[in-house]
Amino acid sequence: MAKILKFDEDARRALERGVNKLADTVKVTIGPKGRNVVIDKKFGAPTITNDGVTIAREVEVEDPYENLGAQLVKEVATKTNDIAGDGTTTATVLAQALVREGLKNVAAGASPALLKKGIDAAVKAVSEELLATARPIDEKSDIAAVAGLSAQDSQVGELIAEAMDKVGKDGVITVEESNTFGLELDFTEGMAFDKGYLSPYFVTDQERMEAVLEDPYILIHQGKISSIQDLLPLLEKVIQANASKPLLIIAEDVEGEALSTLVVNKIRGTFNAVAVKAPGFGDRRKAMLGDIATLTGGQVIAEEVGLKLDQVGLDVLGTARRVTVTKDDTTIVDGGGSSDEVAGRINQIKAEIENTDSDWDREKLQERLAKLAGGVCVIKVGAATEVELKEKKHRLEDAISATRAAVEEGIVSGGGSALVHAVKVLEGNLGKTGDEATGVAVVRRAAVEPLRWIAENAGLEGYVITSKVAELDKGQGFNAATGEYGDLVKSGVIDPVKVTRSALENAASIASLLLTTETLVVEKPAEEEADAGHGHGHGHSH
């Protein structure tokens, strides 16, 4: 396939046009008075959203050179979303401003490499300043404010704060669609996994079709159990120790005579046991069984560690205050494991999360962490139409990510003002000279853009507002929702510092790449077949 090339200034200008097309689409959504964007879908109803990354993902530009620029900014939005879960529009606006200011200087003869050096130094300084001014949050009211601001709905804020309160900061909060109106909070304490009983005969509560075991022993077995001879010695020990104590069996599978014997004993009322399959597959199953063992104070019975089912005693069994098993789920509440061991296991999983590159692995590790650390909260969301439901669900997910980011690194004043104050550390250009100093100045000028566009979307004169905010003290700023200046943190206009930092760092990283670009290579578009046949006066009857 033939390629076409573009060089120097032409190349950079084409990239800039692409950046502008994408950024101009996204920046109308920034701030409390931001507008919506409607995205056409080939199938189903159109999507209405004001979420930067959702819009960015949909934009493809016709001109192949410009498209490269648009895709680069898309990367900024996606990366910021992955790290902090919010701030995608801010990142896009910053990237556009950095590219615009930077290219002006490159066109005027500045060295791209030195500019990049200056930009990097400035971003590092601003990032450190933001962290230094951040305020840690642990109050429920602060959490509600962050979440409410991200979702643009104070009721959602309260709900997320409630959920965070219940599951702790490592807990899992998921969003599900419900077929009723409004929002509901569903909390599962303890460890839940998605495997239910192997036979409906195990049910103890006929009405709710669930088996509830109070204060049971818990047997955790890595392989299959099919022969009753393997299980009998242990069952006899359990009955001798305490005949009324139920037993939960978690194994790869329980089948054949082992299962039928357990069922018969349950029906006769001689012995109460429930068998469930182990959650997960392969290595993840091993890890999850290990988690359950740590939580309940038991041991995983596996031949590889020298434990055989027909030779073990009661010391390998775990315990819990209560276990509830339904057709699809098992929940273990208040496992009998030692809190030190559980804490050790939690730290081990946290270390794995730090070291993994795969998003999928990270997500699964976080699920395991949450199950050990506290519990799972499900927020059920309902709406009148499919379109509204999608939009609400999306807003909730964003708000949860923003809240996590806030709990992690703290908060700064929102509404774009934190950046305006933080770039004051760049006055004097960090002692740099020449083109490096110009790079620092580029960041200083670009950092006011998010605030400018928040003001513009509210129908005001952007640069007038930014220069006014720059004169105020730290923490003071402009509240676009009310049109007033004042202490933003007090009035609940706050941003997680992680969001603001990630937005600036990702925007700068793409902008400096773009400034140091000299050549673009794209595929030559295929000639349209149709044109060949549509007679240019040849062979048609005239």
From Swiss-Prot:
One GO term of the biological process aspect: protein refolding
Pfam families named in the record: Cpn60_TCP1 (PF00118)
InterPro entries hit by this protein: Chaperonin_Cpn60_CS, Cpn60/GroEL, Cpn60/GroEL/TCP-1, GroEL-like_apical_dom_sf, GROEL-like_equatorial_sf, TCP-1-like_intermed_sf
Alphabetical keyword list: ATP-binding, Chaperone, Cytoplasm, Isomerase, Nucleotide-binding
Enzyme Commission designation: 5.6.1.7
Keyword Chaperone belongs to the record: yes
Keyword Chaperone in annotation: yes
Binding positions (ATP): 29-32, 86-90, 415, 479-481, 495
GO cellular component: cytoplasm
Localization per Swiss-Prot or TrEMBL: Cytoplasm
Catalytic activity: ATP + H2O + a folded polypeptide = ADP + phosphate + an unfolded polypeptide
Gene Ontology MF terms: ATP binding; ATP-dependent protein folding chaperone; isomerase activity; unfolded protein binding
PANTHER family, A to Z: 60 KDA HEAT SHOCK PROTEIN, MITOCHONDRIAL
HAMAP family membership: CH60
Similarity field: Belongs to the chaperonin (HSP60) family.
Assembly behavior: Forms a cylinder of 14 subunits composed of two heptameric rings stacked back-to-back. Interacts with the co-chaperonin GroES.
Function: Together with its co-chaperonin GroES, plays an essential role in assisting protein folding. The GroEL-GroES system forms a nano-cage that allows encapsulation of the non-native substrate proteins and provides a physical environment optimized to promote and accelerate protein folding.
Protein name: Chaperonin GroEL 1
Organism: Streptomyces avermitilis (strain ATCC 31267 / DSM 46492 / JCM 5070 / NBRC 14893 / NCIMB 12804 / NRRL 8165 / MA-4680)
Gene: groEL1
